[in-house]
């Protein structure tokens, strides 16, 4: 009997030991995964955020019915790009082929290559037209269903701009510049938008936050004001409503970021008007979608952008985050455009790396704010500004980000 008891206790002890070991092993794996993610983000202290233009999938009903009937989204237009001058690289050809941006396996590949090269935030362009979401599948089905999405932080930019009929597909609409979709919203739709983004995105553990506050970016200050009687005060009330709903959802506050479509120099008076309006409406930070002021020479383009950045930084009484563009070539959208409309001289990964290093210095010189740098863009194929590998430079632009952000090759 004693022998049986002894055997029983030995068996029990072994089982318990095994169970404890397995628990510790699993806990260790979870902690290692969590630590790996944290180390990936803390490796350099920089938040390198690339804009994602989510047009390359079969969006239904709006995209399919009104713009791209082939079932591949804007690839339909990108493939039709044609050279306008000698040496003009058109059509743009992705190294990985014409993959759909709402495929979680595709986006999973994006996430791996982005984080390996120093890009750790995606800013998804997000739309609301005709009382419904537009192009949302890229984020909902592509990014959020990618098995490794926790490696990458993300936030949403409400791209609240109008769309002319021939802007996104002149092959279909020709010279018809009438408005296809007006981005202005009424209070009812605005409340739906607020509820939707809080519910769908803000509670995700990898949603990008500043001081614990979810970051929500807005593209057009003009269309925002048009939605609320063209009044700074009424717009402030709408944004305060958003803040209140975010607080009810359990967050300390909302970080509202205003994004201007492109950088440009301001006169003294226009600078005062913009800064006064921004402050009245209660925005928390400002950045650009692209560098703006495009010229043929990328070095001149970049030098202008640095001067514009310095002016805006001095004018604003709130954080301004630097933006670096990969390039610019939107000729696939505009048949009349030619050489003078394309950034093509000195438009190389090395030139981009130099400009990105200047943005890094700017971030270092502003220790009072997060080291956030925005990049135009991750996949703006139709505008010729993308980090994703192509048939011309391969992984050149991603390697440039790694050289600057992770390896510090451009540090002085």
Where in the sequence are the language-model features?
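C-terminal motif of bacterial Sec signal peptides marking the signal peptidase cleavage site
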Residues: 27-28
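Bacterial N-terminal signal peptides that target proteins for export
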Residues: 2-17
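Glycan-processing catalytic domains of CAZymes
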Residues: 37-412
């Amino acid at each position: 009997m004693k022998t049986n008891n002894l055997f029983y206790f030995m068996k029990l002890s072994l089982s318990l030991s095994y169970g404890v070991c397995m628990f510790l092993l699993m806990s260790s794996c979870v902690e290692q995964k969590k630590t790996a993610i944290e180390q990936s983000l803390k490796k350099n202290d920089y938040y390198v955020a690339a804009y994602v233009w989510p047009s390359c999938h079969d969006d239904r009903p709006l995209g399919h019915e009104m713009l791209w009937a082939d079932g591949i989204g804007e690839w339909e237009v990108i493939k039709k790009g044609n050279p306008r001058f000698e040496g003009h690289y058109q059509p743009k050809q992705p190294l990985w082929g014409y993959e759909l941006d709402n495929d979680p396996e595709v986006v999973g590949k994006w996430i791996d290559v982005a984080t390996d090269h120093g890009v750790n935030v995606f800013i998804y362009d997000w739309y609301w037209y005709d009382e419904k979401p537009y192009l949302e599948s890229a984020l909902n089905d592509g990014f959020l269903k990618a098995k490794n999405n926790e490696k990458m932080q993300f936030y949403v930019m409400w791209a609240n701009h109008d769309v002319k009929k021939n802007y996104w597909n002149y092959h279909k609409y020709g010279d018809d510049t009438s408005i296809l979709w007006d981005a202005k919203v009424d209070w009812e739709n605005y409340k739906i938008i607020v509820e939707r983004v809080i519910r769908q995105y803000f509670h995700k553990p990898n949603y990008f936050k500043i001081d614990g506050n979810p970051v929500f970016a807005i593209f057009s200050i003009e269309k925002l004001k048009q939605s609320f009687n063209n009044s700074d005060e009424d717009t402030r009330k709408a944004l305060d409503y958003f803040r209140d709903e975010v607080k009810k959802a359990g967050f300390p506050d909302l970080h509202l970021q205003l994004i201007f479509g492109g950088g440009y120099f301001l006169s003294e008076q226009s600078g005062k008007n913009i800064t006064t309006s921004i402050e009245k409406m209660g925005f928390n930070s400002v950045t650009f979608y692209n560098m703006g002021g495009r010229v043929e020479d990328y070095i001149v383009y970049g030098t202008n952008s640095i001067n514009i950045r310095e002016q805006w930084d001095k004018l604003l009484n709130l954080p301004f985050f630097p933006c670096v563009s990969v390039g610019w070539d939107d000729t696939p959208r505009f048949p009349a455009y030619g050489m003078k409309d394309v950034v093509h001289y000195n438009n190389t990964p090395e030139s981009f790396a130099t400009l990105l290093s200047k943005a890094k210095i700017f971030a270092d010189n502003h220790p009072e704010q997060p080291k956030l740098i925005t990049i135009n863009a991750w996949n703006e194929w139709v505008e010729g500004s993308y980090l994703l590998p192509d048939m011309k430079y391969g992984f050149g632009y991603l390697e440039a980000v790694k050289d600057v952000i992770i390896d510090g090759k451009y540090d002085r």
